[in-house]
């Protein structure tokens, strides 16, 4: 039976792109006033959508409305300020213990207001404009990020550190990520890029467009997507894939107990079995961190590079030999795979954005 494979791919794909969700109907209820304190010093910041917000100089009660932003807050060491996040914020494991405010596309304004945040973090690609406007109506500032490339993710991390008034942490994290990417490019220098198909969904077959940060991450790993589409999440036919004949199929399941053998069922399916990559079992299976615009994406890039170009990792390059083993930001390099807290059952299309 190939059903388990479909569930594996579907589980990862549910987090990538969204259908139109129902209108936000939650309204904030009366909540008890927070304890009286001295007024916080305020200043203006500009988010990545060009919006000017007035926020505390030192935000201390933060709510994250996206898993990627929750991970970034932890990477910066500011998790003690995180007073709430979404049902999908599952990493690092401690994030699951934070008070929940609902989903990514349908958070509860009542629950958000009850936590008295002085800053809410949102991302343009996953959260809804209606949510941001509703927060504004309740005078709750919402800082938005909008990364499109891996470099943008690193820059967003550093900007968020500035917003949280911990610029040194942002510089440490950004420098570590940049150093690791530079070392990786040194390893891959001169090697031909592997032509890959990043599989988001099998039925229908959906991949990633050339303008997404996922496609950029593939490039950093010594790969190039065979899908040259301006759409972010294009649907493609098996006939087109058969014509393109990728060297590897890349999967990013959301749980750790997945191995190449779990994809062997592809060889029994019409359309798939005519692909050279399927016949040769050329599958790259990496962490779903690759679909989260957060610092951990670099770990997923490194893992993909190891699978596509094992010959490049026989000997560490000179710059890696010189790097100290106790790099200041190394603490946030999480394992390659995420433990899943969800079942393998199919989800609705409205949940597809939720793991971003």
What are these regions (language model features)?
Residues 11-23:
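Bacterial N-terminal signal peptides
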Residues 86, 211-234, 253:
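His/Asp/Glu-enriched short active-site or ligand-binding loop at hydrolase and phosphoryl-transfer sites
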């Amino acid at each position: 039976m190939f059903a388990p494979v479909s569930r594996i791919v579907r589980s990862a794909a549910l987090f990538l792109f969204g259908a139109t969700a129902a209108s936000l109907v939650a309204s904030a209820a009366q909540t008890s006033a927070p304890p009286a304190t001295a007024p916080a010093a305020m200043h203006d910041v500009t988010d990545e959508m060009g919006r000017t917000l007035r926020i505390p100089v030192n935000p201390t009660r933060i709510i994250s409305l996206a898993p990627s932003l929750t991970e970034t807050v932890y990477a910066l060491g500011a998790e003690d300020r995180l007073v709430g996040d979404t049902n999908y914020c599952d990493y690092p494991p401690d994030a699951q213990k934070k008070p929940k405010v609902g989903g990514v596309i349908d958070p509860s304004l009542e629950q958000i207001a009850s936590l008295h945040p002085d800053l809410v973090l949102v991302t343009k690609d996953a959260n809804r404009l209606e949510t941001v406007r509703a927060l504004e109506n309740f005078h709750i500032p919402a800082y938005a990020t909008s990364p499109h490339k891996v470099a943008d993710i690193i820059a967003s991390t550093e900007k968020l550190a500035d917003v949280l008034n911990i610029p040194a942490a942002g510089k440490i994290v950004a420098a570590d990520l940049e150093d690791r990417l530079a070392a990786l490019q040194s390893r891959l220098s001169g090697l031909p890029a592997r032509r890959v198909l990043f599989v988001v969904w099998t039925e229908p077959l959906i991949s990633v467009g050339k303008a997404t940060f996922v496609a950029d991450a593939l490039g950093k790993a010594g790969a190039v997507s065979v899908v040259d589409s301006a759409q972010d999440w294009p649907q493609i036919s098996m006939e087109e894939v058969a014509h393109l004949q990728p060297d590897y199929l890349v999967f990013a399941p959301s749980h750790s107990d997945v191995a190449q053998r779990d994809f062997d069922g592809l060889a029994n399916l019409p359309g798939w079995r005519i692909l050279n990559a399927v016949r040769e079992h050329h599958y790259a299976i990496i962490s779903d961190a690759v679909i989260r615009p957060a610092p951990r994406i670099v770990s997923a890039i490194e893992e993909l590079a190891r699978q596509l170009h094992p010959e490049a990792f026989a000997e560490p390059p000179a710059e890696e030999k010189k790097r100290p083993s106790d790099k200041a930001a190394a603490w946030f390099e999480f394992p390659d795979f995420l433990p899943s807290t969800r079942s393998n059952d199919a989800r609705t299309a409205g949940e597809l954005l939720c793991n971003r």
